[in-house]
């Protein structure tokens, strides 16, 4: 299924539902830094997020150092942001809710 790139107004509307996510200057990706109490919590979050990503067949760009996980989402095939990015962001929020400091 081909996902259509969202218009800037739709992206901004979706962002109002997500705390702490930022739109990059080009409007082509969203990002957030998640902070946890320790590496085990960070890795647990990444595991849950990976399962959600696999279910959606949509995978994040992320970077982990100890208790911090930096996430960037976009849809390469669409050249910007799609509904999939926001579905994955919401799934990540649920995964993080149990351990974010």
Curated annotation (Swiss-Prot):
Gene3D superfamilies hit by this protein: Transcriptional coactivator/pterin dehydratase
Database matches in SUPFAM superfamilies: PCD-like (SSF55248)
Pfam families named in the record: Pterin_4a (PF01329)
Keywords of this entry: Lyase
Cross-referenced InterPro entries: PCD_sf (IPR036428), Pterin_deHydtase (IPR001533)
GO terms assigned for molecular function: 4-alpha-hydroxytetrahydrobiopterin dehydratase activity
Protein name, as recorded: Putative pterin-4-alpha-carbinolamine dehydratase
Species, as recorded: Rhizobium johnstonii (strain DSM 114642 / LMG 32736 / 3841) (Rhizobium leguminosarum bv. viciae)
Origin organism lineage: Bacteria, Pseudomonadati, Pseudomonadota, Alphaproteobacteria, Hyphomicrobiales
């Amino acid at each position: 299924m081909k996902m259509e790139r969202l218009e800037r107004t739709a992206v901004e509307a979706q962002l109002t539902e997500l705390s702490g996510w930022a739109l990059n200057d080009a409007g082509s990706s969203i990002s957030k830094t998640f902070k946890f109490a320790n590496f085990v919590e960070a890795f647990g979050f990444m595991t849950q997020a990976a399962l959600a990503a696999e279910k959606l067949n949509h995978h994040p760009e992320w970077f982990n150092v100890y208790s911090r996980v930096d996430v960037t989402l976009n849809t390469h095939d669409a050249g910007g942001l799609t509904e999939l990015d926001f579905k994955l962001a919401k799934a990540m929020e649920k995964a993080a809710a149990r351990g974010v400091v």
